[in-house]
Amino acid sequence: MTAKLYGIPTCDTVRKARKWLTEHGIDHQFVDVRESTPPKSQIEHWVNSLGAAKMVNKRSTTWKTMSDEDRSEAETGDTSAVLLANPTLIKRPVLEHGDVLDVGFSIDAYTQYFQQ
């Protein structure tokens, strides 16, 4: 089964996750969310499964330049619509692998997900 990793190639955390997957021989597909934004239904699934707080990247440049109204919408309103319109706000990387859905990168978590 091929894992899917969503993010942007310039993100250090995404780079670490991609490197780890490659070094451990894990078959994976990388999706650059700026070039191929996931559909709203998929983003909604992520938000519903993991929560808005975990999906919104408050360290991103996009977040820092957003109006207070847009930030409020991202936190308590239609988070999925805001992430769809601003894919660089998606906390990254997002990992999908079978029943696994996770955001961020942790060697311990990835080791558990891909026990060989």
Model regions: which residues?
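Thiol/selenol-based redox catalytic cores and closely related redox-interacting motifs
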Residues: 33-116
